[in-house]
From Swiss-Prot:
The gene is SAHH. It comes from Pneumocystis carinii. The lineage of its organism: Eukaryota, Fungi, Dikarya, Ascomycota, Taphrinomycotina. Keywords: Hydrolase, NAD, One-carbon metabolism. One of its GO terms (cellular component) is cytosol. It is an enzyme of class 3 (hydrolase). Gene3D superfamilies: Adenosylhomocysteinase-like (3.40.50.1480), NAD(P)-binding Rossmann-like Domain (3.40.50.720). Belongs to the adenosylhomocysteinase family. Its EC number is 3.13.2.1. Substrate binds at T47, D123, E148, K178, D182. This is Adenosylhomocysteinase. GO terms for biological process: one-carbon metabolic process; S-adenosylmethionine cycle. Its cofactor is NAD(+). Binds 1 NAD(+) per subunit.
């Protein structure tokens, strides 16, 4: 049957991905005492790499229910393989908004024997918001939340400030081995790969991958605007420039904008350069980055995409309302004819292009992020009373370095301090090697 074929296909890809995810495999090998005998509600893109995370959590003792945090990001063969192994997963590619909400709500009541969640593993904060707003009783036995992405972390800090956050949370996004690898290298690689299918780079990889698969355009000699120059924006800009594009940056933070200038990028405001660009990429996490005045200034067949978590950066509602017609070119590629006679090409309906039009980040960088997630879940679940008070916390530097160490063993060899060097620098031989406030 089709379901069996999908599950078998997914299982083969999961086994292949495990070779590139040494951090998660090390967790399985080194934690056979099963430190996570717990019910975890997970909401994160249901991809092959996420399947390896889910099965790691299960091997560590957890009962898991899962949904995807984006209506387009599920890889159906990955979901089928996980479902075939007996794990409750509620996700498929191309969900409606109503189906998406049904999925994340249904997973909360799908634990065996009527049990409720003890932990939340979130990406974007949707499950956290749902439980806080609609199912507050579930928080009584919830020991904590780990959050994957910038957008969700921002929401947690806002909830904490307003007195609405009721359980401690760990900010996985700002672990160095997440933000400086997944956000930076993963995004840019996917973007490029989706532009040229034989390039396998990492966030630098996934952006290009998405654009290429969707449009088949040549990037070289094009003008590209990247809105936002955080870690994700940096990766996108580097990927586009590496493909031969002339890249313009828009940014609100003067320090980050100065960084972009020093990297050789033109820094401008969107209104002044919207008529010059062939490709637009939003990577800000903010709303209304591209809207009416920008659409009307754009070239014919300008390509617009978003790599921020939510679909608020591009004013898609205005496009739908004001366009003369919409032509669907292929899945997640739509061409809007405006009243001025020019067309706009929108990818993935303004949602994550690297997962809507491609397969997301590579297994290696996702292993880094997901190993942080596993360690965060263990830290919260096994914490002594008062170790993680109500608030938003970080994993300690020692664990961040351990995540890096597990993955470096696959890629290279690490130099060790001698006892004399350790004494001279006043740094333990096994780390941590940097202070908590060190900026990599």
């Amino acid at each position: 049957s089709c379901r069996y074929f999908l599950a078998e296909w997914g299982r083969k890809e999961i086994e292949l991905a495990e070779n590139e995810m040494p951090g998660l495999i090390s967790c399985r090998r080194n934690m056979r005492f099963k430190p996570l005998r717990v019910q975890i509600a997970g909401c994160l893109h249901m991809t092959i790499q996420t399947a390896v995370l889910i099965e790691t959590l299960v091997e560590l003792g957890a009962e898991v229910t899962w949904s995807s945090c984006n209506i387009f990001s599920t890889q159906d063969h990955a979901a089928a393989a996980i479902a075939a192994s007996g794990i409750s997963v509620f996700a498929w590619k191309g969900e409606t908004e109503e189906e998406y909400l049904w999925c994340i709500e249904t997973q909360l009541t799908s634990f065996k024997d009527g049990k409720h969640l003890n932990m939340i593993l979130d990406d974007g904060g949707d499950v956290t918001s749902l439980v806080h707003n609609k199912y507050p009783d579930y928080l009584k036995n919830c020991k904590g939340i780990s959050e994957e992405t910038t957008t969700g972390v921002h929401q947690f800090y806002k909830m904490l400030k307003e007195g609405k956050l009721k359980v401690p949370a760990i900010n996985v996004n700002d672990s160095v081995t997440k933000s400086k690898f997944d956000n930076l290298y993963g995004v840019s690689l996917v973007l490029i790969y989706k532009i040229i299918s034989n390039i396998k780079l990492r966030c630098r990889e996934s952006l290009i991958d998405g654009i290429k698969r969707a449009t088949d355009i040549m990037i070289a000699a094009k003008v590209a605007i990247v809105a936002g120059f955080g870690d994700v924006g940096k990766g996108c800009a580097k990927a586009l420039r590496g493909m031969g594009a002339r890249v313009i940056i828009t940014e609100i933070d003067p320090i980050v904008a100065l960084q972009a200038s020093m990297e050789g990028y033109q820094v401008a405001v969107m209104e002044e350069v919207a008529d010059q660009a062939d490709i637009f990429v939003t990577a800000t996490g903010c709303k209304d980055i591209i809207c009416e005045r920008h659409f009307e200034a754009m070239k014919n067949d300008a390509i617009i995409c978003n790599i921020g978590h939510f679909d608020v950066e591009i004013d898609v509602a205005w496009l739908i309302k004001k366009c003369s017609s919409i032509s669907n070119i292929k899945p997640q590629v739509d061409r809007y004819l405006l009243g001025n006679g020019r067309n706009i090409i929108l990818l993935a309906e303004g949602r994550l292009v690297n997962l809507g039009c491609a397969t997301g980040h590579s297994s290696m960088v996702m292993s880094m992020s997901f190993t942080n997630q596993v360690l965060a879940q263990i830290a919260l679940w096994t914490a002594q009373e008062g170790q993680y008070p109500l608030g938003v916390h970080f994993l300690p530097k020692k664990l961040d370095e351990e995540v890096a160490r597990l993955h470096l063993s696959k890629l290279g060899k690490l130099t060790s301090l001698t006892p004399e060097q350790s004494a001279y620098l006043d740094i333990p031989i096994d780390g941590p090697y940097k202070s908590e406030h060190y900026r990599y």
